[in-house]
Amino acid sequence: DFHTHHLDAPAGSAIVNLPLEILSGATPFAPLPDARYSVGVHPWWSSLPPAELAQLQQQLLLWAARDEVVALGECGFDRLRGDWAVQEQLFPLHVRLSEAYSKPLILHCVRAFDRLLALRKHYRPTQRWVIHGFRGRPALARQLLQADFDLSFGEHYNAESYALTPPSRRHIESDEGRLPIALLSTPTIERPEGFNEKV
């Protein structure tokens, strides 16, 4: 399970995305042995007061260095929710941490693929950028794959987009729902060469 919000996922079975209350420090949290986590400032949180956002960024710096954190994100852009200008300000920090700690970037993207494509071209990252919960059409999937993005597929997905994505570039996730059973039965899911061994 490449990306889930279920904190009770069995240790080692998933990359668990830590929620706002844990990242902010409002809720005490002790990572489980052998568990794997991702941390990031979600674009929906971009409407929070500036002081809270500053605190989140400080906490992100601390969490990103931890061994049990194997990915940054989810982060990214959402044209329908949150403060776009703040989302633009938050994104570079995630890229820097992803590169500094050699951890992939898990991306939330709603109606902003043009921006992500431009940013990938600008940064030329060495780490994988993975679009989570991808449900776009084949034309968009091809465009993203050609730009070197990975795609992660969840409960709702475009079957043709999934089929055209090379096994080494696709992932499956439950997000806030369930793992897609049809994809679980597909034997071609592989660990990408060179991908973080903990992922």
Language-model features: locations:
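Mid-domain alpha/beta scaffold segments of enzyme catalytic cores
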Residues: 1-199
